[in-house]
């Protein structure tokens, strides 16, 4: 029978690992160490030498060798560890994925052909180390993969919005948090950025408290339809059908088809 280790299980494992650094008594301590290089030994297969590093093995014999070669070590504390996510610096002219709950191996995220949400290119960091989530990338029938982003997001409002009032790229961003200078120096790399140590702390409390589970923030048009007989430029308010209540979207008709669709009540 097929089996899967879900992303949520991986996240739980990462969280459990991070929490283990707080220690239980004096038994849960982690260390990083540096050992002296082992001399070449051509009589042992895969032993390695200066030009061919030894292959790591998961065995007690290998562990004994690590201990024998240790020169010094440093204890790793809870202040030395952070959860991270892939780093995507915002760049003008780049296209980003939008948040969707249904990415899978059939319906992949278009930018990287990712089969899961967490592998998609939908979280960006701007030039001031503010982190945003893309909830709309301008996707429409003419641009099914999304549009190029041309205006850098730089707001800290808790309300999802365009990067500016003049932005015409169709992007809607949600501000998440700002990485502190200390965390940038300690944890940020070319490939990864750190997450907040705890959602809802002093740095993220406002964002967390403003979030609403199950609220619809944006919609996209997949088919504009044809032969609508409403007056040119007419707007129509329609209920959103789903497993929630109170959702409403306003559509605009132009050239006998749906021109725009905007959420007027998120439910």
Model-derived features with residue positions:
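Tryptophan-rich substrate-binding surfaces of secreted polymer-degrading and adhesive proteins
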Residues: 1-211
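Conserved, function-critical positions that sit in or immediately flank catalytic
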Residues: 166-267
């Amino acid at each position: 029978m097929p089996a899967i280790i879900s992303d949520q299980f991986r996240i739980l494992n990462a969280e459990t690992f991070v929490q283990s650094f707080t220690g239980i008594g004096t038994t849960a301590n982690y260390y990083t160490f540096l050992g002296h290089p082992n001399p070449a030994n051509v009589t042992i297969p895969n032993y390695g030498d200066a030009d061919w590093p030894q292959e790591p093995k998961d065995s007690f014999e290998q562990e004994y060798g690590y201990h024998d070669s240790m020169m010094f070590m440093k204890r790793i504390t809870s202040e030395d560890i952070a959860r991270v996510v892939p780093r995507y610096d915002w760049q003008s002219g780049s296209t980003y994925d939008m948040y969707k709950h249904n990415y899978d191996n059939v319906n992949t995220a278009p930018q990287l052909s990712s089969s899961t949400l967490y592998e998609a290119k939908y979280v960006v960091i701007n030039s001031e180390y503010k982190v945003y989530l893309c909830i709309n990338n301008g996707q429409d029938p003419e641009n099914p993969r999304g549009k190029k982003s041309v205006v850098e997001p730089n707001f800290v409002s808790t309300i999802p919005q365009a990067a500016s009032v003049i932005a015409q790229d169709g992007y809607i961003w949600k501000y998440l948090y700002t990485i502190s200078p200390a965390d940038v120096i300690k944890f940020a790399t070319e490939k990864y950025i750190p997450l907040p140590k705890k959602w809802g702390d002093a740095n993220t409390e406002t964002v967390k408290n403003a979030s609403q589970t199950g609220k619809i923030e944006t919609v996209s048009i997949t088919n504009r339809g044809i032969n609508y007989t409403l007056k040119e430029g007419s707007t129509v308010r329609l209920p959103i059908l789903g497993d929630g209540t109170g959702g409403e979207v306003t559509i605009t008709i132009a050239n006998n088809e749906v021109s725009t669709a905007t959420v007027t009540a998120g439910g």
